[in-house]
Amino acid sequence: MQHIVDVLVIGASQAGLAMGYYLKQNNILFAIVGKENRIGDVWRNRYDSLVLFTPRWFSSLPGMALKGDPNGYPTKDEIADYLEDYAQKFELPIHLNTEVISLQKEDEIFKVTTNNGNYVAEKVVVATGPFQKPYIPPFAESLSDKVYQVHTSRYLNPSQLQEGSVLVVGAGNSGAQIAVELSEDREVYLSVGHKMKFFPLEIMGKSIFWWFKKLGLLNVHINSSLGQFISKQSDPIFGKELKHLIQEGKIKIKPRTESILGDVISFADNSQIQVQNVIWATGFYSDYSWIQIPNVLDHRGKPIHQRGVTSVKGLYFLGLPWQYRRGSALIGGVGADAEYLINDILNH
């Protein structure tokens, strides 16, 4: 089956839905394709205790606020249900269970092959986001079968793990939240390859994101000197729990994980430990190998763009970290980038 649209949006999570909102507002013939079974599954399938560090007032898309206390912090299930409700409210044409196999361009027309039919479009917005495939270091293969290992993308709760100690490798906010959760009744090690920075969730009774907004930090753009500086820094850990547990000795910090042999894990300071469980909080990587169009990706496989606009006429990206602003990859920030793209789409 072949679908013909003016604009095809690839990705049906927050970036794709924000783009869909503006396309719908402008009466453009479009479709959104997503590989999930249900809208919001990207969030719904994350670990049970996941809570966003952005307050509800900064965790919604254009045209529809997130329900609940605006100063409270939403759970992952709230966000999943919100995205589903959002798509229904604006009657966005979404085709689920549809995974893109290839994107090509022939004679000014984009041709998209999927597992569920083909699409022809004048313009394409790639809104798959940065969290596509879990990254696990190659030396994980050397870990003994007796040690249970799981990436954060497949971790749900402590009951998955076997009895005994845990090493969490990677100290982003997911790794921090999981380490805190596990420290209640386990010996927990946290392997960190950089100096951790801790930001409180609130200052003087207001969310730190209220202060970020007040100071203009959320709108700092990548082309500014401040933006260049911030973008090169590691992300801070939001909240005080991890810091307190480290100080109390309930979570033991180890430097970068260097190698594994059986059940012995070695670190950058030459220390070694043996644990019964390893959680890889080592992040994700983007896979755009299905984009079969020249001059779209750089030598690292990353999109080449200016504010999401590529040099290939009609091809756009949305939902990238630092796409233009500090908040571009956050739910509350993606709408501004979608609005910028709709103006470019309408003018070309």
Curated annotation (Swiss-Prot):
Keyword Oxidoreductase carried by entry: yes
Highest taxon of the lineage: Bacteria
Entry's Gene Ontology molecular function annotations: flavin adenine dinucleotide binding; monooxygenase activity
SUPFAM superfamilies hit by this protein: FAD/NAD(P)-binding domain
Matching Pfam families: Pyr_redox_3 (PF13738)
Keywords linked to the UniProt accession: Oxidoreductase
InterPro entries tied to this protein: Auxin_biosynth/cation_transpt, FAD/NAD-bd_sf
EC number: 1.-.-.-
PANTHER family named among the record's database cross-references: FLAVIN-BINDING MONOOXYGENASE-LIKE PROTEIN (AFU_ORTHOLOGUE AFUA_4G09220), FLAVIN-CONTAINING MONOOXYGENASE
Protein name: Uncharacterized oxidoreductase CzcO-like
